[in-house]
Amino acid sequence: MKPATAKISSLALKHNLELIHQKAPDSKMIAIVKANAYGHGVEFVASTVEEQVDGFGVARIEEALTLRSKGIIKPILLLEGFFSAKDLPVIAVNNIQTVVHNREQLEALKQTKLPNPIKVWLKIDTGMHRLGVALDEVEDYVEELKKCANVEPLIGYVSHFSRADELDSDYTRIQLNRFLQATEDKGGPRCIAASGGILFWPDSHLEWIRPGIIMYGVSPTDTPSSEFGLIPVMTLTSSLIAVRRHKAGEPVGYGGTWISKKDTKIGVIAIGYGDGYPRNIPSGTPVYINGRIVPIVGRVSMDMITVDLGEDCTDKVGDEVILWGKELPIETVAKHMGILSYELMTKLTPRVLTEYAD
């Protein structure tokens, strides 16, 4: 019997990357490993896929330095750029690449003394309206970056789709056209396709792509990843720690929010919000036990959840429970909860054990 455990498959990870290569065979790949590789373990993921990818993308300089400390030598890109001019010498010494998306970053590059030039990617706002320089500012930024001694001569260009998972929207096509026009004749590498772009917008597969959630076998939409040929890298499991007879009309859990309409058996599973399993979920959220789906009933506790096993169940203490994985797609669980698959994976706490397989 084990407590909450995230089982991570290297074979699934490698399979997904091969599938991505097949979809964009002419593009180089930046593997996104921010947020501890979406909860999968950044050291394991990076070392597993280093030979299959051309670089890594992270959100914080600390994440980049962790990769370097683990012996990763491939290029690493700071997707949000640097937060302080004090970071620039560290970036230069550790051969880290950075996005530039605002005037403050540009001025810091001009004014800081560095031991060697840095590879820079200019982020262009094509319609996400979160980060990036305006379309009418691109030429000025490019000119200033090319004059800066701290910047390597070949500038990269990057942008981000806001609706790549909305196949009936024209907005992605509009963003792509803006990006292509803004970078026309610039000569540097370009990257705009993340997971949604890779799956649904082949015209956006430019010199570089940057897979995130699909690398981990999860769909960027409500559609289960299996329909795209992806295999979940993470299977979240736990164990039944109690099976109890329960009378009709009796409540379960804090606040008595769920009352059984008939005699049944209640299973208690060793996972709760202390492990990162969301607290505010509806009754009926599915889990997988012994080949079938059963519903969560009552409130999620810090360490436990309760499920309705049915009166005639044969489940016993110690049986494995799957919270999500190949048998129960995380997309299905997330949709039932009304949240994103990204949230489920990245919110798991250190209390959840990790097992690396294959």
Swiss-Prot record:
Tree of life domain: Bacteria
Q: Could you tell me one molecular function GO term of this UniProt entry? A: pyridoxal phosphate binding
State one Pfam family annotation.
Answer: Ala_racemase_C
Q: In which pathway does it act?
A: Amino-acid biosynthesis; D-alanine biosynthesis; D-alanine from L-alanine: step 1/1
Q: Which GO terms describe its cellular component?
A: cytosol
Q: Which InterPro entries match?
A: Ala_racemase (IPR000821), Ala_racemase/Decarboxylase_C (IPR009006), Ala_racemase_C (IPR011079), Ala_racemase_N (IPR001608), Ala_racemase_pyridoxalP-BS (IPR020622), PLP-binding_barrel (IPR029066)
What cofactor requirement does the entry state?
pyridoxal 5'-phosphate
Q: Which residues bind substrate?
A: R130, M302
Instruction: Could you list this entry's UniProt keywords, alphabetically sorted.
Output: Isomerase, Pyridoxal phosphate
Q: Active site located where?
A: K34 (proton acceptor), Y254 (proton acceptor)
Keyword Isomerase set for record: yes
Which EC class is the enzyme in? isomerase
Q: Which family would the database say this protein is a member of?
A: Belongs to the alanine racemase family.
NCBIfam families, per the entry = alr
- Please state what the protein is called: Alanine racemase
Q: What is the lineage of its organism?
A: Bacteria, Pseudomonadati, Pseudomonadota, Gammaproteobacteria, Pasteurellales
